[in-house]
């Protein structure tokens, strides 16, 4: 491990503030060090704990980051002027025209071409697209400034 790496300096460089984060300081330290390709055992040695504890801290941190992403996506959904539900079984090439039509109706300009929109969907929801078909119900939201957010939806929804 590079002895010159200081977790405090890493966190200061990115402006981490534990009071404003869903991560604990220790979780942020572990993630920052892992992003610098430091092995868990070396991080444990640096922070005075076991590799197993570092593994647990990292796993919890990544879960917290994913929960935060989902929370932001939910908050964006509440204010997005464009919300499009895509059913499982939909041909992926039907998605862009559907999204663009909804955006036109709302007077919102989407910032993605068809191929980039489909790539965004595929990247956002694991297993969403297989063999040119949507595998899980999706919610596609577009903000006033054209930013697209994609979430997988539960197949069971109550009205």
Swiss-Prot record:
One of its GO terms (biological process) is DNA-templated transcription initiation. The keyword Mitochondrion does not apply. Signal peptide: none annotated. Gene3D superfamilies: DNA-binding protein Tfx superfamily, archaea. InterPro entries: RNA_pol_sigma70_r4, Tfx_C, Tfx_DNA-bd_arc, Tfx_DNA-bd_euryarc, Tfx_DNA-bd_sf_arc. Keywords: DNA-binding, Transcription, Transcription regulation. It comes from the Archaea. The keyword Ribosomal protein does not apply. Pfam families: Sigma70_r4, TFX_C. One of its GO terms (molecular function) is DNA binding. Belongs to the Tfx family. Putative transcriptional regulator. This is Putative transcriptional regulatory protein rrnAC0199. It comes from Haloarcula marismortui (strain ATCC 43049 / DSM 3752 / JCM 8966 / VKM B-1809) (Halobacterium marismortui).
């Amino acid at each position: 491990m590079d002895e010159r790496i200081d977790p405090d300096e890493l966190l200061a460089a990115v402006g981490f503030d534990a009071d404003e984060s869903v991560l604990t300081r220790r979780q942020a330290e572990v993630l920052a060090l892992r992003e610098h390709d430091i092995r868990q055992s070396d991080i444990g040695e640096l922070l005075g704990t076991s590799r197993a504890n570092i593994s647990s801290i990292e796993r919890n941190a990544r879960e917290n980051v994913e929960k935060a992403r989902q929370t932001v996506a939910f908050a964006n959904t509440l204010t997005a002027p464009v919300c499009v539900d895509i059913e499982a079984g939909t041909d992926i090439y039907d998605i862009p025209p559907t999204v663009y039509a909804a955006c036109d109706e709302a007077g919102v300009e989407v910032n993605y071409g068809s191929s980039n929109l489909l790539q965004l969907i595929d990247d956002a929801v694991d297993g969403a697209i297989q063999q040119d078909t949507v595998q899980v119900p999706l919610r596609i939201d577009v903000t006033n400034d054209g930013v697209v957010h994609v979430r997988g939806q539960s197949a069971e929804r109550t009205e």
